[in-house]
Amino acid sequence: MNAIVDTGYLVALLNRNDEHHDWATGLAEKLTLPLLTSEAVLAETAFHLQSSTYVLKLLQEQVLQVAFECVSHLEHLQDLAIGYADRHPDFADLCLIRMSELYPRHVVVTVDDDFRVYRRNKRQAIPLLSPPKK
């Protein structure tokens, strides 16, 4: 399965103490490499893990691929930021919404419930993989 990955998934995958770690590791076996993401997601992930080491290793091993250059999509990102201003999306979320438009055959893997509200191409639900609700 082709996937675009969000910060929460990567943190859960790499942090054994994360509440979604078992879900993330089980899902990892089903995802096709490389997993697509943005630099914003990588920065957030390194911040939450308090280390860049794991992120860099996943890039070097081609588990992750940066497949989005934000400067090429600034106008669209701005439109998304304005359209979802009431939800206060972070920059990484805006990038992933746009990536889901650019890679329509990929699912977004996230623990973020806001992606249930976000839409690609203004009206289409974004295909998601998220942990089950407890």
Regions found by a protein language model. Name each.
Residues 3, 22-88, 98, 102-106, ...:
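PIN-domain endoribonuclease scaffold, especially VapC-family toxins
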Residues 112-116:
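Low-complexity, intrinsically disordered Gly/Pro/Thr-rich segments
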Residues 1-18:
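Metal-dependent nucleic-acid phosphoesterase active-site entry motif
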Residues 6-7, 38, 111:
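A secondary-structure boundary/capping signal
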